Structures are given as structure tokens and as C-alpha cells.
């Protein structure tokens, strides 16, 4: 008999194991999460397996009594807190502004995954009926918000996920845990109720209308009332800071308790209450710096997954007398993890506005983990099939093979547990394998030769996936000053003695990339040391070593993500501000596609739109032109207009868009060109103000140009570049004229060169 002072009890041993593991995990949590990219669920499950009843035999929850009931209630507490936090962390009015994405992800995608999982279970487990396969498949339809925390939380990898995709996965994982109840009860009612028409009636009236619809309304009412009450208390000074921070946790417990008491879906009540509670993002902004929700979630997740690792039914994974073997479960897990969500998300990608391209669709389809929600739904299903209640009976009650649906009750728990274990391994380590493969593939040896490498020390370290700010023109001054100050710190100061001056002048060495060519200022001038004084290095604030803080300093507002060929700009809440595709930006225009014979651009709609654009451009050019001028004899201006109209649209806009003239300028230009032919007595070699004459090969003025007959000599004009008029103004008598007088008497003429138009 051992000494009474060191007697070990089961609860105290459980406290020591869970507390010891949690302490060790927190001491090295940064390395595990940020370096190894492993979540807390994976490490906690492995700890439970080691200390559980099949290895160390120190932590044995199966000896505590009714294990199913304990597991169900622990899972209920964790889920109501997690789904409430998921709803509270969403941006302002997210469910209303993104209802289309949520509708597609919660109904078509879930139904597709439910039916696909049913087919695999019905094919691989031979003794299961189709309705029983529907019931088991409904347990794994929902995604888990706990396992999805690695991509929807605040970790290092989650910051690389675009905000719109992260918010969509967060809202889906919080809402579909409660949405799995209708799928489950449809299969259960079809199994236990005869005839089938009663099953449909009860399913619509009890499950859809009362439990789900009324549960959502009740949760929204609770959230709105709680939001108004906490605002009132905070304004009147009735709450302290500690109570304010923990208010969301106790409100989640209240939603779970009141939902269970009145018989509605408590998970939907909690999620809707969280979304309504933080509908205006007021509470999220108030608690943004405290991180109290993350602390509570971490404690609950670590404790529960240690418990999950200890209750895994390892002997039941291989039961030959039940036609259940390990290879069937392995094949089933592979098929379900691949085909449950990925094909559905790729299929409905065009109907989800928050999914931009196939890369995001593949990412969203892969991260649909199976976790705590599957265990909770499985225990509810077993209780309904056993005793037609949500409270499970002790395990001894299901040992009788004479009860209905005995085989389904026996194989349901090991099948769901194996799928949960597979999801923990795959989704918990997929980020680690992704980052490892990415790092291996990007190893390269590069060599760059520069004249001076001092400027490289001032460049920020850019990591793949990190958003980069686009600096405005005003920020160029500070950039130049920072480069100059860094060069001053690394080079010695040269002191040159001035013989005429009493003091010495200090000259600083120039930057290597600014030594030959002077740096241009934003206004077109040069940077001057007196105009832009360098800032003192000692007065600068020291850089923070935390990478996240440095990234926040670089990107205080909008964030930019390059996803494949798509450039997405988001605000701080994950809303898409702009979406640009490189294919659209760099691709050929409509006119180029029509010229190249693109079959997609030859459709009637594209041709008609191109025709309307050309017609509108022609109408705008001829809008102010008088009718009498259109009937005149073709002159140089009309020939230029005809050439301009026959040019492609994209070349007109890019080359001569700044030379458009109005009707007054056109009349002045034609009047001056007409006077050229009338002044035969004047010297033709004297250039007139504002007029650029054309010259032929013999350097003589062309008579065809004076008469306005250029249509026969267009090909000859293309081979000659027109010479420019001299800069100095010359009068008709050959004497120079002052610049001011020349500017006053010079006509406002914009002469379009034919050779430039044809180029």
C-alpha cells in the first residue's frame, strides 16, 4: 500500500498532463507555429495519443463513466465559443454584403460533399444501407473552425491569405457546423420514421422552421440586445475593462445553454448572435489590442484535443467481423478528403464572388477540415438512433445486436474518428509541407554586378506573398534622403579647405547610382542638399525586430496580393477594392483581335460594340465642324482628317491624342495654308511664324502642297521627314523680331505632319 500523501487520482493526473503540455507548448509556440507551421490541434492530439490508454496509459478518459455524454458536452462548449468568435470576428455587416457567397458555400457545396461522401461510404462499407450512409456522411459535411484557425486566424501563414478569402472561410466554418443538423436529421427521420411522408413533414416543420430558422432569429435578437446593452454600459461607465473583455465568452455560453433548453440548434444560435453582436465592428475594434478571445480559444483547443487524442478508438479501426478494416478506412479517407469539397468549389467558382480564380477555388476546397463538429454531430446521431434523444446512453446499452440499426451505431463512431484523425494530420501539416516545398523550389544561386553595393543595405527585405506599398510621388524625397543618409554613415567625410573662406566646407561622397546622372526630382529638377536636408540618423526610431510590426509599418492601410495572374487590392477589413488581371491589362485590344482573326473577338456583340465606339469617336471629332466646310474642296486639313479617321483606334489615342484642335484653330490653319499659294511675290525660303513647310528632295517647296493636292504624293512624303522651323523669329522683310511680339502675332496653329500620321 502506497503512502497516502502520494495517492494519484484520475482528475488530478488529467490536470497535470494537460497543464504540463500546455505550458511546454506555450514556451516554444512561436517556433511550432511560425517556423514549423504546425497547429495546436496536431500537437495536442499527438500528446493525447502518447499519454492515452494505448501507450502510456496515464490519461484514460474512457474510465470516467459515460464517455459519449462527456465528449458531447465538451464539444458543445468548445463549438459554441468558436462559432460565436467566428461570427464576432467578421467585418462590418459581412453576412449581408456577402450573402451570395455564403449561400453557394452553405447549400450547393455542402449538398455536393454530402452526396459524394455518401457514395464512397456506401461503396466501401458493404453492410451499410444507403440511408445509413447518408446519416454518417452528414456528420462530416461541416468544416471545423478550430482546425481552420491556421488560415483564418492571425498566424504567419494566415497573413498571407487574402482577406476576402480568409473572411469567407471563417464565415463558412462558423455557420456550417449548425447547418449540418438539417442534413443529419433528414437521414435519421428517413431511417426511424415510417411512412416516409411523416419524415418529410417533421423535417420541414421541426428542423427547418423551428430549430434552424427560429434559432437564427433568436440568435440575432440576442446579439442585437447584447450589443446595445454593452454600449450603454460602456458609455455610462458601468463596466470595468476585465468584464468588457470576457463578455463575449459568457454570452456564447448563454446562447448555447438557452438554445439547448428550448430545443433549437444551439450552434446556429451562437453564430447568429456573434454576427449580430459585432455587426458594426464596434466590439472588435475595442478588443483588437487585448487578444483575449485568442487566449480563451487557445486554452480550449489545447485541452480538448488532448482529450480527443486519448479517446481515439484504435481497436475499432480494424473489426473483421463487422466488415471494417484499416485499408477500407484509408481508402475512404483519401477519397473523401480529395473529392468532398475540391470538385464542388471548382464547379461553383463562377457563382462565388469572393473566389477570384481557380487557385483560390483550389485553396478554399482543400481547407475544409473535419474536426470537433464531426465528433459532436456523430454523438448526436448515435443518441438519436439509440434512444431517440440527444443525450447519449452509456456504452453498455448498445452491445445488444437486437436493437434496430445496431450495425450503423457500431461503425459510425470509428469511421468518423478515423476521418477526423486523417483531417488533423493532413490539414494540420499541409501548410508545413507547402512551405517546405516552396522553400526547396526557390533555392537558387544568383550573381549581380553593380558599381556600388551600398544602396542594397537600405532595401527592405521582401518575402514572397508579402504585400508591397506603391509609394506616391511625394514619398520620393524621403526615399532619397534615407539613401543619402545611409551613404553618409558608411563613407568618411571629406573636408576640403577653401583658401578664400575662413571656414571649411564639408562635402559628402555621392551615391554610386547618382554619381554619373543627377537624380531627378518629382518636379523635374535636381535634388539639392540644401533644399532637401538629410535627416539625422540618431533621431530615427530604432527598427522593431518583429516582422509583423515592420510589415504593418510598411502597409498601414490597403494590402496588395498577387494571386497567379490576378492583382487584388484589399482594405483593412478584407474587402476587395480593385481586381486587375494581367491578361486584361497586357492583352490585345478588340481591334487587334479582330485584325488577328481571333474567333472570340469575332462575335457579333464585340463587333457591334467596336463599331459603336468608332462611330462615337467620329461624331465627337466632327461635332463642332460647320456644314459649309464639309462641302468645300479637299484641303490639307481635310486630308489630314481623313487619314486620322482611317487610322486604328488604339494608335490614334496613343500617338496624337494631345494634338486635337477645335473649329477655330482649324479655320485659322486652313486660312494660313491658303495664303501660302497667294503670296507668290514673297520669298518661299523664308519660314513663316508657326508654319512648318514641307520640302521635296531638291529642298524646294512643293507646289502640290500649296495647291492642296497631296493625294498623289502621299507615298513620296512618307519617305521624307519634315524639317523644323528655326527657333528665332524672322519677319517678312528678313529682320529678326522680338519674342514677345512674335508670341502676340503668331497664330494658334497645330499642324499635323503627314509622315508622323502614317508612321
From Swiss-Prot:
The modification Phosphoserine is found at residues 446, 735. Gene3D superfamilies: 1.20.1530.20. Residues 514-529, 537-547, 590-601, 622-647, 655-671 have a biased composition (Basic and acidic residues). GO terms for molecular function: sodium:proton antiporter activity. Residues 724-733 have a biased composition (Low complexity). It is a multi-pass membrane protein. It comes from the Eukaryota. InterPro entries: Cation/H_exchanger_TM, Na+/H+_antiporter_fungi, Na+/solute_symporter_sf. The modification Phosphothreonine is found at residues 442, 448. Residues 696-713 have a biased composition (Polar residues). Glycans are attached at residues 699, 713. It holds the Pfam family Na_H_Exchanger. It is found in: Membrane. Disulfide bonds: none annotated. Keywords: Antiport, Glycoprotein, Ion transport, Membrane, Phosphoprotein, Sodium, Sodium transport, Transmembrane, Transmembrane helix, Transport. Residues 514-558, 578-606, 622-759 are annotated as: Disordered. Belongs to the fungal Na(+)/H(+) exchanger family. Sodium export from cell, takes up external protons in exchange for internal sodium ions. This is Probable Na(+)/H(+) antiporter C3A11.09. The gene is sod22.
